[in-house]
């Protein structure tokens, strides 16, 4: 879980949006593309998900500048049915094509009950929560997941890596509420964070193997739904990866209309009931004051950050200064 920075300055939402958008335009993207990425990154900052916020602007701009990602993609719908669509991201970062895929899935779900869209040939996906939340904010249940081309192939490694750490793709379920915080499981599939490596963590594979088998299974399923189902392994991916070396990922977004299965009002009220009962019935997790389900903390931080400004940590400031100086933004 992302922790609030110990040292920070307050920055307004609008200022970050303007800055990030200016950087992306300088790096070669169209205005609408820059606006899309910036909006999603600032949303992450508002929710306190610092790892996937505007701290990434510097690296993303470098990807556009170096030719690792396509700043001016021609995003196409390759095939489509009443409830399904397949998009080609043309080597760009995942944000714009996955946002388009989410809107398509929403439109289909509202008409037919379920909508699913996959995207192939994209670079970094960002938080899966972006796309599941787009569905949720449209009054639907949202699910999103990412996969990577040739994931799991480490045949060239000098020493075989630990199986318990073999992947950590992003995955998200987003369930709308009535009045309280929604339930949003915005996570990655491995039980360990990417930085949690070493003997003290390796021993856990012996002490709690069931937890690692679960996360290994989640990783395998995520890789196939977000990668295999999206077509990242098809032959056309080789050319895209040669043209845009960072574009080795794919993604999937699923939107489910609640009405037709159950009254939307009843479902939203049941989400509220679950959140309320858990809060009243259970001891909080260590380091927290309230027994909250996933999604509640992000909701609280968004309210706080919109009132007081986003708490912008030292790492974010360092990356912002660097990209500002390089692009003169």
Where are these regions (language model features)?
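A generic, well-ordered mixed alpha/beta core segment in the N-terminal half of proteins
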Residues: 82-164, 172-175
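Catalytic-core signal marking the mid-to-C-terminal active-site face
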Residues: 2-3, 7-11, 16, 26, ...
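Conserved active-site and cofactor/substrate-binding residues in soluble primary-metabolism enzymes
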Residues: 11, 15, 19, 29-36, ...
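Secondary-shell segments that build the walls of catalytic and ion/ligand-binding clefts
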Residues: 181-241
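Active-site cofactor/substrate anionic-group-binding motifs, chiefly glycine-
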Residues: 52-106
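Acidic, glycine/proline-rich low-complexity segments that act as flexible tails and inter-domain linkers
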Residues: 1-13, 17-37, 42-43, 50-68, ...
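Phosphate/diphosphate-binding glycine-rich loops and adjacent basic-rich segments that engage nucleotide
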Residues: 150-206
């Amino acid at each position: 879980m992302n922790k609030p920075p110990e040292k920070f300055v307050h920055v307004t939402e609008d200022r970050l949006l303007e800055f990030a958008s200016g950087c992306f335009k300088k790096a070669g993207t169209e205005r609408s593309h820059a606006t899309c990425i910036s909006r999603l990154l600032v949303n992450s900052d508002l929710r306190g998900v610092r790892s996937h916020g505007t701290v990434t602007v510097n690296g993303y701009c470098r990807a556009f500048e170096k030719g690792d990602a396509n700043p001016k993609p021609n995003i196409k719908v390759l095939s489509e049915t009443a409830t399904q669509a397949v998009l080609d991201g043309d080597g760009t970062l995942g944000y714009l094509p996955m946002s388009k895929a989410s809107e398509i899935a929403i439109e289909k779900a509202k008409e037919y009950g379920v909508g699913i869209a996959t995207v192939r040939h994209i670079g970094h996906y960002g938080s899966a929560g972006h796309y599941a939340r787009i569905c949720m904010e449209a009054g639907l249940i949202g699910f999103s997941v990412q996969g990577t081309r040739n994931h799991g192939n480490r045949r060239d490694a000098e020493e075989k890596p630990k199986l318990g750490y073999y992947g950590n793709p992003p995955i998200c379920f987003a369930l709308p509420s009535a009045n309280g915080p929604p339930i949003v499981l915005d996570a990655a599939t491995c039980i360990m964070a990417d930085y949690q490596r070493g003997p003290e963590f390796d021993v856990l594979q012996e002490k709690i193997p069931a937890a690692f088998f679960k996360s290994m299974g989640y990783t395998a399923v995520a890789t196939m739904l977000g990668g295999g189902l999206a077509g990242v392994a098809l032959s056309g991916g080789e050319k895209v990866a040669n043209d845009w070396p960072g574009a080795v990922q794919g993604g999937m977004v699923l939107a489910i209309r609640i009405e037709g299965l159950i009254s939307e009002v009843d479902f939203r009220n049941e989400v509220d009931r679950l959140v309320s009962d858990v809060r009243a019935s259970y001891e909080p997790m260590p380091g927290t004051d309230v027994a909250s389900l996933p999604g509640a903390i992000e909701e609280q931080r968004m309210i706080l950050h919109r009132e007081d400004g986003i708490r912008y940590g030292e790492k974010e400031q360092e990356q912002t200064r660097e990209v500002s100086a390089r692009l003169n933004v």
